Amino acid sequence: GEYLAENVRTQYLKLRGEKLNAADFDLFFKGLVWNQTDPVIEAWQAYYTLESAQAENNQSKIAAALLKAKVLYRDSKAVTDPALMKLGDRIAEADRTWLWTRVMILLQKNRMTETKRVLETLPRPELPAPMKELRSIIDEPTLWLRRQKNLGNLPARLAVFASVRIAHLRPADAARIAQAAVDPKANAFWRSLVWSRIGFPATTQLNPKASSWYAKAGSALQQSPLAVVDAQQLAAWHARALIRDGSWYGLSKVIDAMPAELKREEVWTYWRGRALASRGLKTDAQTAFTSIAHRTTFYGKLAADELGRSYGFSNPPKAMPRQVEIDKGAGNT
């Protein structure tokens, strides 16, 4: 009975979310036990929370609701679902300064149809170029790039837009744009975003320049975290590029700069230990390896190997077999 009721409430909120008011939505939402974190339902919940705060004209509630909604939109894997599209529209109505950030979020997510739809809603003076040119970058990026006689003439925002779009396809071409027009014209945050977005696909494609492109990003991504999609993924792939290069000092720096949650993952605990050991910091390396060497996981076993220890047991025996028992068992074979 509970499962059926939960399923009915969930489907009702998904189908009727846009037709409800804040009070009715909240009534059904509070009745959910397991599905409050469903992406579509979360989007409608954020939508109505913001709507209620605006109706009250409570500025602190509006600020809190906007922050929650922006984080949800940035992190969602379903930005083309109608619920997320409506949420994005409401955020944009409440905060006009977020308009261009929304475009760049969609571009990073490689959601080109939705990017074009949102671009059409922006006031023309806020666009970095005519819509025809922006559509050309989205739909025919290679052809658009061939038509550019001098990349250095591109305005900063247009260069950022084109770099992020083209990085998905050809990181080397995006790097050309970044060197010519992003580096000399854009601020530190946008330079950092562009080079991170170039470094990421370059690493997955095993491009030997990946780590050098990543290095150009610096640390300015932290200046506007709400505009960065999958920041932890970007950091992780930067580390992988350095592992591939055997750049141990650089790897230590990148891992040390990771968010605490990511840095605690055993994969990065292990590689931090490897980096420290390669730099001659044996005591620090052993501390890192020891923290995970008891685990039965892949990296736990690798850490045990580094320490010369036996692997951990998921269900350890009460006592190790004695030699006489081993010999007896061998005699029965």
Region locations from a protein language model:
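Extracytoplasmic and endomembrane cell-envelope/extracellular-matrix remodeling and assembly machinery
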Residues: G1-T333
